[in-house]
Amino acid sequence: QGHRGTPTVLLLLQAAPQVFFLIQGEVLGQGADDAAGTHRIDQDAVAAQVVLRMGNLEALKGQSTVGSLLPALLDKGMTSIPATSPFAVNVPGAIEAWGAILKARGTWSLDRVLAPAINYAENGFPIAPRVGFDWAKQLAKLGNSEGATRHYLFNGQAPAEGSVIKLPALAATLKAIAKDGPRAFYEGPIAEDMVATLNAKGSVLSLEDFAKHRGEAQTPISTNYRGLDLVELPPNGQGLTALVLVNILENFDMKSLDPVGPDRFHLQLEAARLAFAIRDTHIAEPAFMRVGVDKLLDKAFAKSLAAKIDRTKRVPLPPHPAPGGDTVYLTVVDKDRRACSLINSLYSSFGSGICTEKTGVMFNNRGSGFVLKPDHPNALGPAKRPMHTIIPALAMKSGRCDVSFGVMGAHYQPMGHTQMVLNMVDYGMDVQAAADMPRAFYEGNITLVERGIPAATVEGLRARGHEVAVEPSPWGGAQAIRIDWDRGVLIGGSEPRKDGCALGY
């Protein structure tokens, strides 16, 4: 519980997102989803892992209206849900998640937790460099919504780096939540404003959908990679993808390869294509999955997948979406070595781009993660959640948390987790070096590499059949804390691709 007035890990993780959704406004907010993984030491010194999967419980919930939505969209000739469509908006889960975690483990009142965010929203905060860079790219999206234009553009422009902005509508919304609790977001005037905004755009979400929303506590899933237990969120999250990916790569002697050489990146890319094919075929709401998690995590299955990889050339596989996405990740470890790994996201930058005029709530576009194929496990349907990309992670050794970490970047996240794990386990890197390493991913049939990858590696990938393009903008963003149990030291890492920092308190 911590000393009086001293914030514990979960209190810090409650106060921080409220501030971050303001200062990182283009990537998360009250209309976002939330996911957290926690590790605590019980009084008998036995380690226990708890993963709380909060948010996005009702994806377009409503048995009658949503049940008829899929054929209606198919009749319109739609093959996917557009990211800026009102049909892409799910009931936001973050507010309910914050309240549930605080109620379960917190010692501060909600109004105390929200006070810093309310202060910044009312009195202003400066725009960080990466935030300003990303915000400026969303002018067209923000200009398509009267609410977004009103609350997120300033004289018709994105705020410049270093400028100070205020968000009074969000401050008022937060004050209402601080006063009356999370249900003030899902019932009453705030919910009425949200539903009216969405219904005017054609959404079928109702006041009942918001009122019934509840988060869910789930049990984590894990696999062991050369002595390290990688712990991820279960489906409907894509954490399973990261576990399948490291299982595949365990069949190769990665340690013997140059960490920035073509062999290492070729194997990672080929294994990723296989793992993402598994994701896009199987991962969905657990009740709708036709192949269980245990079977997909079977080491023999991973070995059979590894056998499909040709070390000398690229093997054609189905294309995959761009890394993209906009997310905020943070992790905290307190004095008692309780760790929490938390991620919050609207999915795309500024989500759906749909924003309420009165309350300033920007809506997510998680519904675009559904598949518009009636026979697919991840098909759009009543009371279902779509395949979800946000995945905070924990790495465990001997039942204790070794590293609490995450890598922002939508579809890139499983690859980011894998590269972090390999960098730490196979190449002995500390968390900062593991996060700083240059990255390679793919978009469709194009292999994308960051500028830090050596020219010889690029040529080596091309020689193996990869069509390589250098990506001018970095993707992903890792934050990590390692617990050195022997020396009693915490080691933090925060990479330069984002506006983060490693901070001791």
Task: Tell me what each language-model feature is.
Residues 59-72, 76, 204-206, 338-403, ...:
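Active-site rim segments in enzyme catalytic domains, especially the processed small/beta chain
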Residues 2, 17, 24, 29-79, ...:
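His/Glu-rich zincin catalytic helix
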Residues 217, 324-327, 388-390:
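Short, small/polar residue-rich loop motifs at catalytic or cofactor-binding pockets
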Residues 251-346, 358-359, 366, 471-472:
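Internal maturation/activation junctions in enzymes
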Residues 111-122, 193-195, 211, 259-273, ...:
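Short, well-structured alpha-helical segments that form the helix of a local strand-helix-strand
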Residues 78-180, 185-187, 192-237, 297, ...:
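Noncatalytic scaffold domains of N-terminal-nucleophile
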Residues 336, 384, 417, 426-473:
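Extended C-terminal subregions enriched in glycine
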